[in-house]
């Protein structure tokens, strides 16, 4: 088949019209050459001027590009990241500093710097000025502030099923992977509470107890040689080893609306109605000296301060034997507070015969399963979380109902004198999680401190004088571990509690005895990265051992001076179990001379 050739058509009307227009254009350019050139130059100048004003000079792909208008648009947002801090930069993208994630900020959407495909927005911080922040670290959704999807347990803790509850769930061990569902608040970039999931259980855990990688969670904390100090202190007496306890630094509480006296000088009151009935006399005495605080019993073993509804739930026997009504006790505490004094509520923790009567299943038991009477009491096991919940619930009620500034846990230990039972295997501690005694005590204090800080109060822990030694005691108290957690640690180095050495009686030499003890306690304070305030119980009663020497103003002043000279400057609490007003008058010169 032959292809047909296209016929050439010429001289059509449209082609003639185009030729005529082209001829006219050539004639115009010949006649107006200079005018056209001038117009072109003007157009080029205008374009260049616009580039200069707008700062839009062309850059290579590797150079920083800045975009800015005279009227930038502002958006509110939050700093987000997987880390606790985020860098911010100057216009050249040189780092200027860091800000904490979770911070609410304002950023300009039209004032940006772009580099390597990432946009940085000019961001304004509430207190730290401004700087450029990566788009990857800005969000408008508060639930996207934390970027991590999993966290790993660094310090073993019991999950809290509800964020606002003191009730405890399962224990999660070190290294356990937790799925992050949400979070509640941040403080300096650290998450206050993670909402997590673990083996089908949902709960909350503080951000201070987790890490974002398995390596960080299992890392041994040894800054400043902390780990090395404790690693060699093994389980010598049955209380556990020092190495397995937690020494990560903790931020100590400092409540602006609840200032703690510094130093704190306190006298002690029982919850006996006869004592509390004389409250005006004690207040008058304190006002006439340098005393600035009171310690008042919430409960002391079987001496119950008031009929708290918490007892109705956990220990009806304690409720039945309360010394005062809520209103009577409340009136006393309010009078102390109205007089301007700091009030500490003392609460015995794991020494509680009434609770063991009501709940023998949680009592330390003998081999046959019966509650064991040891050291003049029945003892709820410090391993049992239900006991923890009971004591913290009681502390919360005392804070909310009575207005205490601080909760002091006494008998925060296992009973002493159980060594023979343990050797013979004739004792049951109900140790559900296979913890050491020292681990249980420290973990209880972590739990209690975390909860009570939410109520704006401080937490103190009383410890035996023996804990100034460089070992874990048989009853689970180890000074550095407790000091690292509590806000206040209070040794009880009463001179008449020290053993006689030949003819030397320590209680006849209060200054020397207290110097030796305080020197050792100060060493223990230096062995923890975030030590508590050391506020010591002092002997303010006559010696209970021969020759029953009197403790007057000079002896008490010597105790106070010895503590201060050794660096234990947090103050003192004067122990006199009878709360004798007569003895207080004898001691007046010592308390008037306080600085």
Where are these regions (language model features)?
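Boundary regions of SH3-family modules and the immediately adjacent low-complexity/disordered segments
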Residues: 62-74, 124-150, 197-252
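SH3/SH3-like (including bacterial SH3b) beta-barrel domains
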Residues: 89-101, 161-174
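SH3/SH3-like beta-barrel superfamily modules
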Residues: 100-134, 173-208
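Active-site-adjacent "subsite" loops/lids of carbohydrate-active enzymes
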Residues: 255-274, 331, 345-397
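Catalytic domains of carbohydrate-active enzymes, especially glycoside hydrolases
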Residues: 279-304, 401-406, 488, 563-571
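Aromatic-lined carbohydrate-binding/catalytic grooves of carbohydrate-active enzymes
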Residues: 289-324, 416-423, 584, 591
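Aromatic-lined carbohydrate-recognition surfaces of secreted/lumenal glycan-active proteins
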Residues: 342-352, 408-411, 437-474, 529-543, ...
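Substrate-binding cleft of secreted/luminal carbohydrate-active enzymes
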Residues: 486-500, 509-515, 520-595
């Amino acid at each position: 088949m032959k292809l047909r050739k296209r016929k050439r058509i010429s001289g059509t009307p449209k082609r003639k019209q185009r030729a005529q227009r082209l001829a006219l254009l050539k004639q115009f350019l010949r006649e107006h050459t200079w005018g056209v050139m001038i117009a072109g130059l003007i157009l080029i100048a205008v374009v260049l001027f616009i580039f200069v004003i707008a700062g839009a000079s062309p850059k290579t792909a590797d150079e920083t590009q800045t975009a800015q208008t005279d009227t930038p648009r502002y958006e509110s947002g939050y700093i987000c990241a997987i880390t606790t801090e985020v860098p911010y930069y100057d216009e050249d993208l040189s780092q200027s500093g860091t800000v904490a994630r979770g911070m609410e900020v304002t950023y300009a959407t039209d004032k940006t710097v772009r580099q390597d495909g990432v946009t940085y927005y000019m961001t304004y911080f509430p207190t730290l000025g401004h700087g450029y922040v990566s788009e990857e670290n800005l969000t408008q959704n508060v639930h996207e502030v934390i970027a991590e999807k999993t966290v790993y347990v660094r310090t073993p803790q019991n999950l809290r099923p509800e964020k606002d509850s003191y009730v405890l769930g399962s224990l999660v061990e070190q290294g356990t992977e937790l799925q992050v569902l949400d979070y509640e608040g941040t403080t300096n970039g650290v998450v206050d509470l993670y909402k997590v999931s673990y083996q089908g259980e949902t709960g909350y855990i503080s951000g201070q107890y987790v890490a974002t990688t398995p390596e960080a969670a299992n890392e041994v904390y040894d800054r400043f040689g902390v780990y090395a100090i404790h690693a060699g202190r093994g389980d010598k007496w049955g209380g556990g080893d020092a190495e397995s306890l937690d020494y990560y630094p903790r931020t100590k509480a400092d409540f602006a609306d609840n200032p703690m006296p510094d130093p704190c000088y306190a006298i002690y009151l029982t919850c006996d109605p006869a004592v509390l009935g004389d409250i005006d006399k004690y207040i008058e005495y304190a006002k006439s000296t340098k005393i600035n605080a009171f310690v008042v019993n919430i409960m002391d073993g079987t001496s119950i301060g008031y009929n708290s509804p918490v007892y109705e739930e956990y220990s009806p026997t304690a409720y039945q034997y309360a010394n005062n009504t809520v209103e009577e006790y409340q009136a006393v505490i309010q009078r102390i507070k109205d007089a301007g004094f700091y009030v500490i509520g003392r609460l015995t923790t794991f020494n509680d015969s009434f609770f063991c009567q009501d709940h023998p299943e949680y009592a330390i038991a003998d081999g046959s399963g019966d509650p064991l009477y040891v050291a003049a009491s029945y003892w709820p096991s410090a391993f049992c979380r239900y006991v923890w919940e009971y004591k913290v619930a009681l502390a919360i009620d005392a804070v909310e109902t009575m207005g205490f500034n601080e909760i002091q846990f006494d008998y925060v230990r296992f009973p002493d004198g159980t060594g023979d039972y343990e050797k013979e295997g004739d004792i049951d501690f109900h140790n559900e999680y296979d913890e050491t005694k020292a681990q249980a005590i420290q973990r209880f204090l972590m739990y209690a401190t975390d909860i009570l800080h939410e109520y704006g109060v401080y937490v103190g822990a009383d410890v035996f004088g023996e804990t100034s030694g460089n070992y874990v005691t048989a009853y689970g108290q180890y000074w550095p571990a407790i000091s690292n957690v509590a806000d206040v640690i209070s040794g009880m180095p009463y001179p008449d509690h020290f053993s006689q050495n030949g003819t030397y009686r320590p209680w006849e030499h209060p200054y020397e005895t207290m110097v030796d003890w305080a020197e050792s306690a100060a060493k223990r304070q230096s062995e923890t990265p975030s030590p508590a305030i050391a506020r010591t119980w002092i002997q303010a009663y006559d010696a209970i051992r021969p020759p029953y020497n009197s403790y007057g103003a000079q002896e008490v002043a010597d105790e106070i001076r010895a503590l201060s000279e050794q660096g234990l400057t947090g103050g003192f609490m004067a122990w006199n179990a009878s709360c004798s007003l007569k003895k207080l008058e004898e001691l007046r010169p010592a308390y008037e001379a306080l600085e």
